[in-house]
């Protein structure tokens, strides 16, 4: 072999090697807003020489539609909430987890970790990740007196000044106003036909006050920033975003209490990157990452060891000083046996003139 052939061969090998190094595996996520922020995802990408690509969902129904509509294979990791996590596990849409690959799993809150939501047939299908309420948010410069009830949204002087989530959570909220969470809050997720009709009537009465229904956190943040709304049902994510912008926002849980969620991380059954996905789950439930996620979202972490990295003020803001007491004020989402009927009622509310 002559010198020219050797040089050309070495050049070809070098080019091939360079191409391999440039090509990165992509881990695809379908998660709630804020769960793939570069501030904490970038370190995982660098360590594992991969790219994390995220699509955000606006509701649990959107997640279920995508998983059941043939696009499940497009995603490796999902973040279902407590209302659909069990359904996903039962339907075989998630892969069982090898807990030996998740050493931080045992650091998670026992109350969250031992929930039956993501357990089926002796297997664990998801890890608790973040939790929180759907609180009442209001602009302190636009609302003179602090509201203490969800019923404040129906006040006549708030015509065209409120926003609600385009989600079944608004159905639950109206049911609370009507007292259907008494004596058992679980009844919110299994309302009768008569109760759902009463909820529909109550929400149609609310429509003159609704400036816009929001579907993403950024949308509600903008509505407040532009002073289009004065009060809304929201997420702690919006409170966190608006406070960082210096906006005079306040968050509270009304006297009726509120609904809320426990978000989990799951690996889809169709994922072709299950090993990398498991490494991602471990990274996301480590104490240091949990702290970074709370910095972005304002949500409460599933790993209580993350509080060792927080100031006292941060712990108090996230209600990690006494999480059990705070959880008692949150009626965490449950499976809704008649979800199709709930959605039918909600769609009728939206269509009503």
Where are the regions a protein language model picked out?
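A bilobed periplasmic-binding-protein/Venus flytrap-type ligand-binding module shared by bacterial periplasmic
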Residues: 135-142, 177, 262-273, 292
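Mature extracytoplasmic/periplasmic domains
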Residues: 259, 268-330
């Amino acid at each position: 072999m002559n010198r020219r052939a050797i040089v050309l061969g070495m050049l070809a090998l070098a080019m091939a090697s360079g191409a391999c190094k440039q090509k990165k595996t992509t881990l695809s996520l379908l998660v709630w807003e804020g769960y793939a922020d570069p501030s904490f995802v970038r370190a995982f990408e660098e360590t594992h020489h991969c790219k994390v690509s995220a699509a955000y969902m606006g509701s649990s129904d959107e997640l279920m539609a995508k998983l059941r509509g043939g696009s499940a294979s497009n995603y490796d990791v999902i973040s279902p909430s407590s209302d659909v996590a069990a359904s996903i596990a039962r339907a075989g849409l998630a892969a069982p987890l090898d807990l030996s690959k998740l050493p931080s799993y045992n650091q998670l809150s026992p109350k969250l970790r031992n929930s039956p939501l993501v357990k089926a047939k002796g297997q664990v299908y998801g890890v608790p990740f973040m939790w929180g309420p759907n609180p009442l948010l209001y602009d302190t410069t636009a609302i003179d007196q602090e509201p203490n009830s969800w019923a404040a949204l129906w006040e006549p002087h708030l015509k065209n000044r409120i926003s609600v989530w385009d989600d079944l959570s608004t159905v639950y909220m109206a049911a609370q106003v009507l007292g259907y969470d008494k004596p058992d809050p679980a009844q919110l997720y299994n309302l009768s036909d008569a109760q759902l009709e009463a909820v529909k009537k109550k929400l149609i009465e609310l429509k003159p006050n609704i400036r816009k229904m929001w579907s993403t956190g950024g949308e509600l943040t903008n509505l407040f920033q532009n002073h289009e709304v004065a009060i809304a049902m929201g997420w702690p994510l919006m409170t966190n975003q608006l406070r960082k912008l210096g906006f005079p926002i306040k968050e509270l849980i009304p006297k009726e209490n509120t609904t809320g969620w426990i978000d989990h991380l799951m690996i889809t059954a169709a994922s072709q990157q299950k090993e990398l996905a498991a490494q991602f789950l471990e990274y996301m439930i480590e104490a240091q990452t949990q702290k970074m996620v709370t910095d972005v979202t304002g949500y409460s972490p599933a790993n209580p060891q993350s509080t060792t990295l927080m100031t006292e003020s941060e712990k108090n803001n996230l209600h990690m000083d006494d999480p059990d007491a705070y959880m008692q004020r949150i009626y965490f989402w449950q499976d809704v046996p008649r979800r199709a009927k709930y959605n039918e009622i909600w769609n009728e509310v939206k269509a009503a003139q």
